[in-house]
Amino acid sequence: MLTKINIKTKEIASLLREWLEKKGTADSFLWLNNKIDEISESGKERVLFSAYSAVSRHYDRQKIALSTAEINAVPVAGWNPESWTLVQLSRSLLLLSFPAQDSDRYVATLDKIIGAADVEEAIAFYQTLPLLPHPEKFQLRAAEGIRTNMTSVFKAIAHHNSYPAQYLDDLAWNQMVLKALFVGIPLQPIYGLSERNNPQLAQMLVDYARERLAANRTVSSELWELVMPFQPEVVRELREI
């Protein structure tokens, strides 16, 4: 696993709040601000749950359109919200607003959210993983998300998200990379891909490549790049098939 980064929740929340104030309407931001204050002061789950679901009635799904300066201000390596929508950003901020001093209660509360989430709500949750307090406590939830049959939810974990590289064990990491190839999404947006490469993953990819070649199907060039450091002879052999 990569070195874990100490995330300052207040710093991240302040940044998200600043973006939403500039990018959304005044009425939307007023509603969100009121909900954030109510959630952080009361610590009531029902307020968080209702606000998390209601965001889409107050913000539209337009991309947040960050400037280069705003992107460079992001203090979390591997986290890139450039393609996020206002709805997703608002939901992330709500998750960060719930009191987190009691780690068990915080995790249990967010587990309830993802347990009842629709696709868009699940995407926002998984995108927020690298920003959450007590991130080590969401490893099983992240591994579960990787097994989803919804590509959009899987991409929320796999792409532009530093959480997998920092917290998933090799088994879950390898499954994520292999699944990315299987569902046909690129590997390049996976943070920490080279650093987390390992011999077990290389062998899994060789087996996968052999199956595809036997069925006269193409093999992604990104696959060979991961196998080459461990099995260069096999790469040369299979590329000639």
Stretches found by the model and what they are:
Residues 1-98, 177-241:
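N-terminal alpha-helical scaffold/docking segments in eukaryotic complex subunits
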Residues 90-209:
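Eukaryote-skewed repeat-based solenoidal scaffolds used as protein-protein interaction platforms
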